[in-house]
Amino acid sequence: MYKIIAIDIDGTVYSRKHGVHELTKLALKKAREKGIKIVIATGRTISTTRLIAKKLDLLNTSIPFIGQNGGQVFSYETNGKVKIRYTKKFTNKQVNQIFNIIKQHKAHAFCYTLDENIAYKNKGISIFFWWMKKRSQRNVKVYKPNKKLESQITKYICFGKKENMRQMRKKVEDLGFSAFSFSYVTNAKENIEINPIGVNKGYGLEYVAKELNIKPEEILFFGDGENDLEAIKFAGTGVAMKNSKLEIVKKAADDITSLTADQGGVGEYIFKYVLKEEIPKEFSIKK
């Protein structure tokens, strides 16, 4: 019997085209009614996770969620406040080191900080920057190496030419930092997320499991991206989404959903293997 169902957001329970599928909403609701804890595990921040938690009726549950690829564990408490268990951050020396590498590889960088109202960027303007600024709703400041940070950096999102990004990724990984990439906008470009040393969703999921006194084999995890790999491996049952574009993710998983995120793949899987119930007739399942 599963005691935790952990879910990635983007490309797993949420798609850009269709949002959160109603079948997935219903399945998670029914799982909660059976006493199963629903844990969000995402690369998003507290504020952007809140939007999806609200759609899934997971606000104010006091259940710990995993944010920033495992760089943060927090909960939306019953009193409406946010309780933070931990937040991993970069030292000032590491921040300067990474910005120098970003400059060498002609990349654009957008950086989240401990303060949900502040972000940092490097010099220059791009469509990527404006998109991130709009999404994050933060006051964005330009990083200057000789000026003290107003809030410590917790995650970098970098964007540039694919070959430059690949070389940059190798450099930051050689220094021990966690890096996750996925194709973004065009085939010639790539988006890379950089987290502090040792940070990944598996680390976050292990922390949550210990807090809730739940064994790995009692955890069901759903994900589609490279940043889901360690959580897929840690969970007793790690499930990759049918729509995942990464073979490494599908090979690491114990199972693969029959449907995509657009089709309600998480919901269909939960109905079949967790609830063991027929899917309501109002849902037309097309495989």
UniProtKB/Swiss-Prot annotation:
Cofactor entry: Mg(2+)
Residue sites binding phosphate per the record: 9, 42-43, 201, 227
Catalytic residues in the record: 8 (nucleophile)
Keyword terms, alphabetized: Hydrolase, Magnesium, Metal-binding
InterPro entries referenced in this protein's UniProt entry, alphabetically: Cof, HAD-like_sf, HAD-SF_hydro_IIB, HAD_sf
Annotated GO CC locations: cytosol
EC number: 3.1.3.-
GO MF: magnesium ion binding; phosphatase activity
Gene3D superfamilies listed in its UniProt record: 3.30.1240.10, HAD superfamily/HAD-like
Family as reported in the entry's similarity comment: Belongs to the HAD-like hydrolase superfamily. Cof family.
Entry-linked NCBIfam families: Cof-subfamily, HAD-SF-IIB
Protein's name according to its UniProt entry: Putative phosphatase MCAP_0732
Source lineage: Bacteria, Bacillati, Mycoplasmatota, Mollicutes, Mycoplasmataceae
